Regions:
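A structural micro-motif
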Residues: 41, 86, 158-160, 193, ...
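Alpha/beta catalytic cores of group-transfer enzymes, especially the acyltransferase/condensing modules
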Residues: 11-12, 105-254
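A short, acidic, amphipathic alpha-helical segment used as a generic capping/interface helix at domain edges
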Residues: 255-272
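Alpha-helical scaffold elements within enzyme catalytic domains, especially in hydrolases
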Residues: 20, 34, 186-189, 266
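FabD-like malonyl-/acyl-CoA
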Residues: 1-146, 274-305
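NAD(P)-dependent dehydrogenase/reductase Rossmann-like domain
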Residues: 218-219, 297-314
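Glycine-rich phosphate/pyrophosphate-binding beta-alpha loops
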Residues: 60-62, 202-204, 257, 261
Length: 314
């Protein structure tokens, strides 16, 4: 059985996420405690107690990434106990999730990755400050139609770009919120079932984040290891394994669209099963891209379900 590990991005946060792993897995608990000490973020409070910080990008990003890494730590602990070998053929993350994937691949210490995505969230927010940035999801419209509308808009001075290629019939565009809103009718006239502004104050994966990409390199360079297991880049939908590639691709990731569906299609032949850590968002998207099964490890019950499958198919 060949596995691929996948990691979700921003938007899947919820109060209480990771609690079962923290309370029942020693490695997961140690991970959270060490991350809190290293970053200065009170992750127990951030993840487990109601509050506004969980929806602020500079805290949302490390919270989601930590939850993913705790789920992975809990799986590795149980797999070792049950003498199961569950090593990925490749790793892939959606947006923020590429950093989780890189850490899980051995490219960065988890605590350093969490500090980095905390900074990444702050840089993204700062780059969009005062620019009226936003994002919009377009449903049931072909990629080419979305791209043409965006290209026509940018040629007339608007700031609108395709940002996330999630699956056929679901694409997210980013740019100035007013420009996005002005195009809502055009997307629908072209055949979109829905064109809805998202509750976002940043415009991810588009040229509005150019300054954030430049600054991110300064923090990324000392944190990266020289080589690691294959990680599929959001910006190219191709795998990379070295620090020099990571520096180029993670900077590009901020200003380039997330090629998620292209990544799954390019590499699904190398895996029999996808395993998502910390949320069940990509599981739903994968159903529209591939016939290969996807398991989402979000709590002890879903961990048990995956381990049962892995034992039956070893």
């Amino acid at each position: 059985m060949k596995f691929a590990f996948i990691f979700p991005g921003q938007g899947c946060q919820s109060v209480g996420m990771g609690r079962e792993f923290y309370e029942n897995s020693d490695p997961a608990r140690a991970l959270l405690d060490e991350a809190s000490s290293f970053t200065g973020i009170d992750f127990k409070n951030l993840l487990f107690e109601p509050g506004d910080k969980l929806d602020v990008s500079e805290f949302t990003q490390p919270a989601i990434a930590l939850n993913s890494m705790m789920a992975l730590a809990a799986l590795q602990e149980r797999a070792d106990q049950e003498k199961l070998s569950i090593a990925p053929q490749f790793l892939l993350g959606h947006s923020l999730g590429e950093f989780s994937a890189l850490s899980a691949a051995g490219g960065m210490e988890p605590k350093q990755m969490l500090k980095l995505v905390n900074i990444r969230g702050r840089l993204m927010q700062s780059a969009c400050e005062g620019k009226g940035a936003g994002m919009m999801v377009i449903l049931a419209l072909a990629d080419e139609a979305v791209e043409k509308i965006c290209a026509d808009a940018t040629s007339s001075g608007k700031q609108v770009w395709a940002a996330n290629y999630n699956c056929d019939g679901q694409i997210v565009v980013a740019g100035k919120k007013d420009d996005l809103a002005a195009l809502e009718g055009e997307f629908k006239a072209a055949g979109a079932k829905r064109a809805m502004l998202l509750n976002m104050s940043v415009a991810s994966h588009c040229p509005m984040l150019q300054s954030a990409g430049d600054e991110l390199l300064e923090f990324l360079r000392p944190a990266l290891k020289e080589s690691f297991a294959p990680v599929v880049a959001n910006a190219t939908a191709r795998a990379y394994t070295t620090k020099s590639e990571a520096l180029e691709l993670l900077k590009a990731q901020l200003i380039s669209p997330v090629l998620y569906k292209q990544s799954i299609k390019n590499y699904e032949g190398e895996a029999d099963c996808f395993v998502e850590f910390g949320a069940a968002v990509l599981k739903g998207i994968n159903k529209k891209i591939t016939q290969k099964p996807t398991f989402s490890i979000t709590d002890l019950a879903s961990l048990d379900e995956f381990l049962k499958f892995a034992k039956e198919n070893r």
